[in-house]
């Protein structure tokens, strides 16, 4: 099994349509942009995802977050609200800039996740299905779309845990 990715054809119209008329995006291209994708399978995808997330430095998972295509949040304060805000932004065909890097597991649902390729000036579309695990770099421009208004995604996210190191301050500077 693999994660399906391809270049969005950028034709006018509804961004939630497949827009699949250009070649696949090579995994090496995504890695160049700071992305890593995995396709997990089996009954233990959450455990597999946690092991991968920890291996790449992400140790703090969230609870499951439900993202609805019809989401209408006015302001985003919590992690869950920020994730849901991406669904709201997709309705206006705008992109969302990831402020911090994270690892995201699709637990249930289906959608499209568009990644900006600033070098090619195009969008790369990732087909989101259960088992897709993504490492999202901070600063990435993305957008999420659903095929229909009833679309949803259940996701788990991991973030870096900040480690503070106490240093003595030398007052003689």
Model-inferred region functions:
Residues 1-70:
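N-terminal leader/capping segments at the start of a protein or of a new domain
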Residues 64-99:
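Conserved short histidine dyad/triad with adjacent acidic residue
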Residues 96-117:
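Short, conserved beta-strand element in jelly-roll/cupin
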Residues 105, 114, 127, 135, ...:
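Beta-strand cores of modular interaction/reader domains in eukaryotic scaffold and signaling proteins
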Residues 115-118, 123-124, 146-147, 167-169:
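A short secondary-structure junction signal
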Residues 143-173:
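Double-stranded beta-helix
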